Amino acid sequence: LMVVTSNADRICTGITSSNSPHVVKTATQGEVNVTGVIPLTTTPTKSHFANLKGTKTRGKLCPNCLNCTDLDVALGRPKCMGTIPSAKASILHEVKPVTSGCFPIMHDRTKIRQLPNLLRGYENIRLSTRNVINAERAPGGPYIIGTSGSCPNVTNGNGFFATMAWAVPKDNKTATDPLTIEVPYICTKGEDQITVWGFHSDNKNQMVKLYGDSKPQKFTSSANGVTTHYVSQIGGFPNQTEDGGLPQSGRIVVDYMVQKPGKPGTIVYQRGVLLPQKVWCASGRSKVIKGSLPLIGEADCLHEKYGGLNKSKPYYTGEHAKAIGNCPIWVKTPLKLANGTKYRPPAKLLKERGFFGAIAGFLEGGWEGMIAGWHGYTSHGAHGVAVAADLKSTQEAINKITKNLNSLSELEVKNLQRLSGAMDELHNEILELDEKVDDLRADTISSQIELAVLLSNEGIINSEDEHLLALERKLKKMLGPSAVDIGNGCFETKHKCNQTCLDRIAAGTFNAGEFSLPTFDSLNITAASLNDDGLDNHTILLYYSTAASSLAVTLMIAIFIVYMVSRDNVSCSICL
């Protein structure tokens, strides 16, 4: 009689378990519980505007020009002449249409209110030291350069804007056909040249008195492929100015043209022209955003709705608006990236009956105790359950998550560059994106980012199978012939494997020989003890073989007799 026993242990690969699951969204599995997450979004709160970190931020065009609007500075109002500091970012702080405190301007006729915005969009801005043309000797002259008491100079005498010359005919106060003057490019550093010009109109009496012609006058400017036409309005202006300045019966219309390096512009005019004088020379790019002054402190990002923001997450939810700097990107819903493994309750051994009732050893759930890692090994035996984390596998999983974060960051940068590029394309227009187009673009980018996060979560969760398969191959190689693969990532060892053994497996220092020699307790065969006197082993074997042979012969004879009877070849009679 043989009795077979086993002192083997079972070693399995496994995943950590957690009792605090989080939820992430995936592309195909919907919402999935995981052991940890990295929040990718934040919802900002409103704050004051600030200087943008790492760069110069411009508030007012001329900080030292007191009681001056940015339009005053842009037009060169006599008491508003000063240096405009260079800046990589600018705040459009005058949220309402702002007029000049000088001669009353008909703002609605032109895009003159956009002139300060245009200048804000340049990093470097300077006013030329010389006049672009000699206004007194321009065609249709000679002219007297007009001034106004509503535009006083620094000595409180009559003055006018430094960027324009009010050309009043000196002697020949008569009507004239359209005249043409070329405006040369005079900037010296390859800058854009912003040339300001305009025209004056009044009631009929004043038009005759100043220009000798009471009819509407025609004006045209052309530069850089852009041509603009105007016809002056005669009379009909309220006596009190919209600027709250001195009462004026007349008005001026002011416009500008942008001349590229080396390219001249032209102005076609009649009576009442305001000829260009000093010009703006501008270069570089400064990002513009609507905001408020003063600027307090520093911030990573300037947001039209939230003010100064310090970036803590790559994305934000809440109100979408234009922003500049190192800003999070707007998304519709909060986003989370999986930072761990798929949630599993504490593991149990499922006793599935296989061939001869063997335990299959399939593991369900995760194992508690893998404090230092997400993946690892478990050992089951007389010692109970031992658990050890595999740091290398865990690090590989973390590296994959980091790679996903970097990919999302690259996507963020590309989208920011796309938005920035779109803004630069409109730079020479008004430097403001159309809100509807901007919202549509933001929705599209938000959808792209959300899909990228869903796919990243899908990949992170699905990669668990890869990590476990790699662990299984590693475990099989280390155990070698000292264990039998029983499937589902489990191996039955021919030796004991307690916590020390498992820790060495996790550390990659396991040596099967070290555990097999002293601790091997392989299949034990215990022989039955027969105590008949005078019998040795050879005699016992002889008895066994004789009995077995006799039994075999008897069975063969019995089978032959039954066969012959069934064929009627042999008859059998039983008599009493």
From Swiss-Prot:
One Pfam assignment: Hemagglutinin
Annotated site residue numbers, Cleavage: 353-354
Positions where lipid (S-palmitoyl cysteine) attaches: 572, 575
Subcellular location(s) of the protein: Virion membrane; Host apical cell membrane
Record topology, Cytoplasmic segments: 566-576
Residue ranges annotated as Extracellular topological domain: 1-544
Cellular component per GO, a single term: viral envelope
Keyword rRNA processing part of the UniProt annotation: no
One MF annotation (Gene Ontology) recorded for this entry: host cell surface receptor binding
Glycosylation (residues): 33, 67, 153, 172, 239, 310, 339, 498, 524, 537
Residues annotated as transmembrane: 545-565
PTM statement from Swiss-Prot or TrEMBL: Palmitoylated. In natural infection, inactive HA is matured into HA1 and HA2 outside the cell by one or more trypsin-like, arginine-specific endoprotease secreted by the bronchial epithelial cells. One identified protease that may be involved in this process is secreted in lungs by club cells.
Disulfide bonds, paired cysteine numbers: 12-490, 68-80, 102-151, 497-501
Membrane topology summary: Single-pass type I membrane protein
The keyword DNA-binding belongs to this UniProt entry's keyword annotation: no
GO biological process entries: endocytosis involved in viral entry into host cell; fusion of virus membrane with host endosome membrane; fusion of virus membrane with host plasma membrane; virion attachment to host cell
Alphabetical UniProt keywords: Disulfide bond, Fusion of virus membrane with host endosomal membrane, Fusion of virus membrane with host membrane, Glycoprotein, Hemagglutinin, Host cell membrane, Host membrane, Host-virus interaction, Lipoprotein, Membrane, Palmitate, Transmembrane, Transmembrane helix, Viral attachment to host cell, Viral envelope protein, Viral penetration into host cytoplasm, Virion, Virus endocytosis by host, Virus entry into host cell
Coarse class of the protein's main subcellular location: virion
Function per UniProt: Binds to sialic acid-containing receptors on the cell surface, bringing about the attachment of the virus particle to the cell. Plays a major role in the determination of host range restriction and virulence. Class I viral fusion protein. Responsible for penetration of the virus into the cell cytoplasm by mediating the fusion of the membrane of the endocytosed virus particle with the endosomal membrane. Low pH in endosomes induce an irreversible conformational change in HA2, releasing the fusion hydrophobic peptide. Several trimers are required to form a competent fusion pore.
Assigned protein family: Belongs to the influenza viruses hemagglutinin family.
Subunit structure: Homotrimer of disulfide-linked HA1-HA2.
Note: Major glycoprotein, comprises over 80% of the envelope proteins present in virus particle.
HAMAP family: INFV_HEMA
UniProt name for this protein: Hemagglutinin
Organism: Influenza B virus (strain B/USSR/100/1983)
